[in-house]
Amino acid sequence: MSIWVKIKNMDNRDGAVVSVKVFDTQGQQGETVELNTQEEVEKLVHGSNKIVVEEVRQP
């Protein structure tokens, strides 16, 4: 499964909250994020302490 992440409100300060949206290439609406998916997002958005996933879209 391939996904890409749109990052909103990126802030590298300690304790910053990062909002991300995950889309498939067709922009289809997805389901609520699962723990393993959020861990993948955290790896993509490295260097951030907190991540808020607004939407998850998967193919």
Task: Put a short name on every predicted segment.
Residues D24-K50:
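Intrinsically disordered, low-complexity Pro/Gly/Ser/Thr-rich segments with frequent PxxP/GP/PP motifs
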Residues V17-S19, E40, L44, E55:
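Detector for intrinsically disordered, low-structure N-terminal pre-sequences
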Residues M1, Q58-P59:
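Short intrinsically disordered terminal tails
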Residues M1-T32:
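N-terminal acidic leader/helix
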Residues N49-Q58:
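A short, solvent-exposed beta-strand micro-motif common in secreted/extracellular proteins
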